[in-house]
Amino acid sequence: MGQVLPLVTRQGDRIAIVSGLRTPFARQATAFHGIPAVDLGKMVVGELLARTEIPAEVIEQLVFGQVVQMPEAPNIAREIVLGTGMNVHTDAYSVSRACATSFQAVANVAESLMAGTIRAGIAGGADSSSVLPIGVSKKLARVLVDVNKARTMSQRLKLFSRLRLRDLMPVPPAVAEYSTGLRMGDTAEQMAKTYGITREQQDALAHRSHQRAAQAWSEGKLKEEVMTAFIPPYKQPLVEDNNIRGNSSLADYAKLRPAFDRKHGTVTAANSTPLTDGAAAVILMTESRAKELGLVPLGYLRSYAFTAIDVWQDMLLGPAWSTPLALERAGLTMGDLTLIDMHEAFAAQTLANIQLLGSERFARDVLGRAHATGEVDESKFNVLGGSIAYGHPFAATGARMITQTLHELRRRGGGFGLVTACAAGGLGAAMVLEAE
């Protein structure tokens, strides 16, 4: 085993996660239609502070992220500070690491705590797939810049005359990798073919995710960590996630056609996570600061790791790469874990990562390690369902997973939990959490 890297301050304090909260997650263009990510972020941070009754001056830093950037609010973190009644002097900056954005926000706040520059901070993320930055074509954009500099009407008209009808069409945000042109679903199809993952296996995992999430809601396990959202025109509150299919049967999944490889594919809308709106945040403190304030932590951040691989083939292997590093830094093995929560971008991606975590060949030939990371115990894995069921507001998912895992660890009497995710650009993230 490699070097253990304890996450403690210079005074020996552990990094405590004292509270976490999220909005309900809503499918694109449903309950949060028209609500921008910055407002979702304000909503969850404001409610989190109200529930914990932590004085505004205690929070010294807010690190927040969004993946679908809005030009009018490029620093979402600072807008949240200014829009929630927090101390105006609170440091705030924004981060983006695709689907691992709130993992990065948590790591940044943890590093500030370890450096001693702060003693308490908030980390999180928000995204809206319903309020999108619809752009213009490159040709129209260039003409508009030139028109702004033109001195006469004739010069302006001459510039506009260069445009064709197709140049006036709106341009939606890109859904493909900038460097490869591949969509996430294309990569999921690659992984299904590379690792021999069948349509039936993918549908079974998706069905399991929805069944577990529906059960978690029906048993009241999520009520404490999901706020009620009141949205214009304030006629009906949103209380629960609206993507979960609690009454579906496995046979229903087989009816859908492939979404990406139309002829030979196995990835469908049902075994993939949907476009989603929502926000989530956690409060982190040094252990001693939490004690000063009389707060009982949900748990502690034991370790974290970020990795990056090539983007051309099977790039959503972040969990298989980052998990062994995070476990190594925590001084733990897979067998020591009480819970494992893996982001389900696609069922194919999830099953491929599970397969590789237990692969001796992958460990030896690809990671350069002597042994496999370890088999994933199904009884510990995504026990409350995952992103396929809950949805995936890109920047919020990590904070959801952290909060959800810590609450479940406490219900089980404590232990260690792994949260891990893949992300666009071949990125991966993993964190080990501890609850007492």
Curated annotation (Swiss-Prot):
The active site is at C99 (acyl-thioester intermediate), H392 (proton acceptor), C422 (proton acceptor). Its EC number is 2.3.1.16. GO terms for biological process: fatty acid beta-oxidation. It is found in: Cytoplasm. Keywords: Acyltransferase, Cytoplasm, Fatty acid metabolism, Lipid degradation, Lipid metabolism, Transferase. One of its GO terms (molecular function) is acetyl-CoA C-acyltransferase activity. It catalyses: an acyl-CoA + acetyl-CoA = a 3-oxoacyl-CoA + CoA. One of its GO terms (cellular component) is cytosol. Gene3D superfamilies: 3.40.47.10. Pfam families: Thiolase_C (PF02803), Thiolase_N (PF00108). It is an enzyme of class 2 (transferase). Pathway: Lipid metabolism; fatty acid beta-oxidation. Catalyzes the final step of fatty acid oxidation in which acetyl-CoA is released and the CoA ester of a fatty acid two carbons shorter is formed. Belongs to the thiolase-like superfamily. Thiolase family. Heterotetramer of two alpha chains (FadJ) and two beta chains (FadI). This is 3-ketoacyl-CoA thiolase. It comes from Escherichia coli O1:K1 / APEC.
